[in-house]
């Protein structure tokens, strides 16, 4: 969930927002002028509010000048962010700064420079200042980036305790069953939007595994739309614009948040009143307490369940879809993955088990290589609260400090044949293997994703089932380009061809 696909057409977000809110009459024009002025003042305060001077004698990172006031490099970056960053790396080295929309971003490229961000303390490089205004309206108050970091760390520890191997063993059969039922509607052959299908399936499987059977049983088309509206809160407009604007997407997000919370409250209260103890994550949270002995409130449990689902939904759905296209492009590799199913699980392909899943090494490497070339989140960010020194430069407070997994995971200094999809590269020595932060699709350090192991279980189970059901092909050789206009870098026009395997 990152900014930085921001404003491809300069002020387009502002313009579109105002078009949604206002009409064409005189009153509307006046309201537009007032709102636009307020937004400019708001953005200006956001831009300069945290800036502080450097200590005497400190050297600033190289700064990429732009003649365009305020917008800076937003247009060029928005059109081709990876190319922009790789060109800057070649010219300026691993640390450099530039301005977009009145904010200064300092990028740390390469493992050594990235270590500053991943090894930092929250009081020095702060995550809440970057992410809270985006996540709090979606997850709710009192959880995640809306609370002091020590409290958030306690909440993550509670969630992580529920993401254990005992639960994963249960999840495999649940995910396999959901996947088979979902693809019954696909028939024998056809062409479908793979990303849309997998996004729906990821929600179904994650809700069943992570929320429990009570909440999953209520997941109908209406509730699925509520999730989509809530997920729509992760947008460039939500990052850039003040939350009080009456945008339709903001209203849909807030309504969905209230309605989903009400569904969760009923399930939570029913579970609290029940004498039955079900071994799942919902029960884990209900039984958890903070260090001071205080139990979680219903509102905290509901917010954490929303966060657990939506934070992982993007990673799993995007990665699953991209891997499908990589396998469709390389039919030999796809067939090897299918044959691995028979080798590991048996010729008759019985129901999957967690232990078998662990032995699907080729499929595991395919996921790993997909995450290398197409990490869902292009940039991880922190707000500098204190001066930070790296590679001989000092980053002042107020800069947004960034690491790009996408760039780090394809640097030619670290990766051999860096743009090739080659799952077998992990069987050999790579320069990157000796670099701690050359491969970070799930982050690292204090903010490493706690759902990484569940994501692997989910994706491996779904794709094991899909490979048993179908063969996949590109349509007329089309391999999707990356859609950089969205917060998560999804495949563009992700339609794939499929045919049911013969028995």
From Swiss-Prot:
Belongs to the cytochrome P450 family. This is Lanosterol 14-alpha demethylase. Pfam families: p450. The keyword Heme applies. Strongly expressed in liver and testis. Also detected in kidney, lung and epididymis. Pathway: Steroid biosynthesis; zymosterol biosynthesis; zymosterol from lanosterol: step 1/6. Keywords: Cholesterol biosynthesis, Cholesterol metabolism, Endoplasmic reticulum, Heme, Iron, Lipid biosynthesis, Lipid metabolism, Membrane, Metal-binding, Microsome, Monooxygenase, Oxidoreductase, Steroid biosynthesis, Steroid metabolism, Sterol biosynthesis, Sterol metabolism, Transmembrane, Transmembrane helix, Ubl conjugation. The gene is CYP51A1.
